[in-house]
Amino acid sequence: ATIDPAVLFIDRCLQLLKPGGRLLIVLPDGILCNSGDRYVREYIMGKKDEKTGEFVGGKAIVKAVISLPSDCFKLSGTGAKTSILYLQKRHANPNQPEQFLPEPQTDVFMAVAETLGYVVKNNIEDYNAGVANDLDKIVSAYKRGE
């Protein structure tokens, strides 16, 4: 069976993080919402316990998901819809370093960036077009806990 390279990349990023380390990664939206990629979400967050509603066994806590504009990577030749995923690696159990401590998945901050501070004209990014960068407002809202 073939494995999506994005999945291998996520796995490697999590391996390289120290316990408690943070990761911001741009991913295709399919990984975040396609039913066929559920195993990726369960690998990251763990499986949801139907009784408690808690996620058990995951490698990371999802802190935020920020949806990016569909034309964000247009100049690189892709029209794939993407999002920024912000994760924090769970802390290792001191008695069993290969196991993670059962840290609760907190509420996930979610936002949509409609503009990134530029427009594409004649295959060139124009940053002087007077377009706002929604990421500034989104980061401020995250820091305020909104």
Residue positions per predicted region:
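A conserved structural/catalytic subdomain of Rossmann-like adenosyl-cofactor enzymes
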Residues: 1-146
